[in-house]
């Protein structure tokens, strides 16, 4: 059973495209077609507007919080082809960096695991993915994967930081030898997996095909110490797939259809323990799904967006149309 614990009146003047809680769950960032990014303090069920950030010249599609070990940092991306990195200094939010290296709308931003440093992946309608790495003293290094997806890239999601050969931790005193990976989804109906080579260049490692229309979102599940890697994907075709890879050396991924919805599915998002998947669709509902003991995914609850109503949990084996 799911309950609505808080409703925030953002006072955005147009459609809200994204809302993200910070690491501690005390701040909420929102973005809208009104070209603004807003940050609210939502502690104790309240809502205090902390910042109204203006800098984009078009609809703002997505926001992403960096890990707090780097300070209070928020990234936003927009139809105006720009990525803006905002930073809070002495209680005031200001533009820290602006990336204008794309030729079309930037649709998705995602921070890498904090273990790698401050790295931001950005997916654009120009088909490219750019990776911004903070090098110190206000400087950002930019790498770009051109033609990552023909027609355009809609989503990027990093793999959790796991050391090869070690499921949970690395030997003390040794610097971990992380292999950086992320997934992307595009208008070519594909999910692609990317890996950083030893020379620092990014290489396409795998191509996952199952969707029959644009891939709208991808979400790499958090690691909980198991050797299995899991990715969720959703599409314009109304389908949500769960992709699993049990053997990193073979890099073989198997898709399982979670559900076929009657409308476009915009977003998928994992719980921090990777056992519940939230699915957001074009029919104004958010559904929550959990894997049962027999490996089937079942809907455990659904919430009508904007209305705060919650349905009863469905019994195992039932399928609930979103």
From Swiss-Prot:
Asked if the keyword Endoplasmic reticulum belongs to this entry, the reply reads yes
N-acetylvaline modified-residue sites:
2
Name of the protein described by the UniProt record: Protein SEC13 homolog
Q: How does it sit in the membrane?
A: Peripheral membrane protein
Q: Name one GO molecular function term.
A: structural molecule activity
Show the SUPFAM superfamilies listed in the entry. WD40 repeat-like
The Gene Ontology biological process annotation of the record reads:
cellular response to nutrient levels; COPII-coated vesicle budding; COPII-coated vesicle cargo loading; intracellular protein transport; mRNA transport; negative regulation of TORC1 signaling; nucleocytoplasmic transport; positive regulation of TOR signaling
Q: Could you give one GO CC term from the UniProt record?
A: extracellular exosome
Q: Which residues carry this modification: Phosphoserine?
A: 184, 309
What UniProt keywords are attached to this protein's entry?
Acetylation, Cytoplasmic vesicle, Endoplasmic reticulum, ER-Golgi transport, Lysosome, Membrane, mRNA transport, Nuclear pore complex, Nucleus, Phosphoprotein, Protein transport, Repeat, Translocation, Transport, WD repeat
What assembly does the database describe for this protein? At the nuclear pore: component of the Y-shaped Nup107-160 subcomplex of the nuclear pore complex (NPC). The Nup107-160 subcomplex includes NUP160, NUP133, NUP107, NUP98, NUP85, NUP43, NUP37, SEH1 and SEC13. At the COPII coat complex: interacts with SEC31A and SEC31B. Interacts with SEC16A. Interacts with SEC16B. Component of the GATOR2 subcomplex, composed of MIOS, SEC13, SEH1L, WDR24 and WDR59. The GATOR2 complex interacts with CASTOR1 and CASTOR2; the interaction is negatively regulated by arginine.
Q: How is its activity regulated?
A: The GATOR2 complex is negatively regulated by the upstream amino acid sensors CASTOR1 and SESN2, which sequester the GATOR2 complex in absence of amino acids. In the presence of abundant amino acids, GATOR2 is released from CASTOR1 and SESN2 and activated.
Positions of the WD repeats? Answer: 11-50, 55-96, 101-144, 148-204, 210-253, 260-299
Cellular localization per UniProt: Cytoplasmic vesicle, COPII-coated vesicle membrane; Endoplasmic reticulum membrane; Nucleus, Nuclear pore complex; Lysosome membrane
Q: Which residues form a coiled coil?
A: none
Q: Which family does it belong to?
A: Belongs to the WD repeat SEC13 family.
Gene designation = SEC13
Q: Which Gene3D superfamilies match?
A: YVTN repeat-like/Quinoprotein amine dehydrogenase
Please describe what this protein does. Functions as a component of the nuclear pore complex (NPC) and the COPII coat. At the endoplasmic reticulum, SEC13 is involved in the biogenesis of COPII-coated vesicles. Required for the exit of adipsin (CFD/ADN), an adipocyte-secreted protein from the endoplasmic reticulum.
User: Which source organism?
Assistant: Homo sapiens
- The protein's superkingdom reads Eukaryota
Q: Which SMART domains match?
A: WD40
Name the InterPro entries for this protein: Sec13/Seh1_fam, WD40/YVTN_repeat-like_dom_sf, WD40_repeat_dom_sf, WD40_rpt
